[in-house]
A protein has these predicted regions:
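Loop/turn-to-beta-strand initiation segments
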Residues: 24, 37-41, 55-58, 84-92, ...
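Conserved segment of the helicase C-terminal RecA-like domain
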Residues: 82-99, 241-244, 248-280
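Conserved helicase/translocase motor-coupling segment
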Residues: 161, 166-223, 228-236
Length: 290
């Protein structure tokens, strides 16, 4: 099984170890110090597929529409080379891109829908609130009112939360305003180029901190049970429809708390937000028909 992002394989590895205690599983990624040795089950980043030739009977590509896999012909070639000639490739994603959808419509790919999560509850739907001049308020060291209310609710409920922002330069502004308004909250920032990214995600997972302020790097592939999510500037162009659906998908993943809050804060609705809302509603309708 391969995924484009190291965060995903690091999260999946202990889960697979728990699910298949008798199986020896190789974990391969660019930061892994351990040399490769033959195992029946390999979990790796998609770049590691370049090391294999006709090796796998079944090759599963998780988050197939995500960066860097989606737009990288070399990684697509590596996928074909790594699978045995008579082997099977399975693509997993909650947000298939246009090319995959076209192949599905043309019956070039067999398609299966997993419309319900394992706990059987519907996907949490997106709530949009107006956030006029949110950047101007941050420059003055103040949190936008909807975000402040959201954080206050999390503190009162003693829940962890994620705040997504559109740009790296927004991270310190939100952090400073949050710490000034809610000094007791243990919060860090994280982004793709952060050298401590993996460690910070682990701190969140171990509940050593209350929140992460993040870019889209945590839009998919990470699970923090019971969290709520806010997206500041959800109408920014960086938030594609797929990214917004994936962000909403961070919520409600625990059977102990299958519901939760997905809050989008923005001056206005745009096409991507409307499409993300429609996609989640579509999946919930499809699940109710099963």
């Amino acid at each position: 099984m391969a995924s484009p992002r190291i965060d995903v394989v690091l999260e999946l590895f202990p889960r697979f170890q728990e699910a298949f205690p008798q199986a020896k599983i190789a974990l391969l990624h660019g930061r892994s110090p351990a040399p490769y040795e033959y195992t029946q089950f390999v979990l790796c980043t998609t770049h590691q597929l370049l090391r294999f030739y006709h090796a796998f009977d079944v090759l599963i590509i998780d988050e197939v529409d995500s960066f860097p896999y989606a737009m990288n012909p070399e990684l697509h070639y590596a996928t074909k080379q790594a699978r045995k000639l008579q082997g099977s490739t399975i693509y997993l994603t909650a947000t298939p891109d246009g090319k995959l959808l076209q192949q599905s419509r043309q019956a070039k790919l067999a398609t299966s829908y997993l419309t319900r999560r394992f706990h059987g509850h519907p996907l949490p739907e997106i709530k949009v609130v107006s956030g006029q001049n949110w950047m101007k308020k941050l420059r003055k060291g103040r949190l936008p009112s909807p975000l402040s209310r959201f954080i206050k609710e999390q503190i009162q409920a003693q829940r962890q939360f994620l705040i997504f922002v559109p740009k790296i330069e927004v991270l310190p502004k939100v952090l400073e305003a949050l710490q000034q308004t809610f000094p007791t909250v243990k919060v860090l920032t994280v982004h793709a180029a952060d050298p401590e990214r993996v460690a910070k995600v682990q701190m969140m997972r171990k509940q050593e901190i209350d929140a992460l302020i993040t870019t889209t790097i945590l839009e998919r592939g990470v699970t923090f049970p019971g969290i709520d999510v806010a997206v500041l500037g959800a109408d920014d162009a960086v938030f594609s429809m797929a990214a917004l659906v994936q962000i909403a998908g961070r919520v409600g993943r625990s059977p102990q708390r299958p519901k939760g809050t997905v809050l989008f804060i923005c001056p206005m609705l745009n096409r991507n937000i409307k499409r993300a809302q429609a996609q989640i509603k579509f999946m919930n309708r499809k699940a109710s028909e099963c």
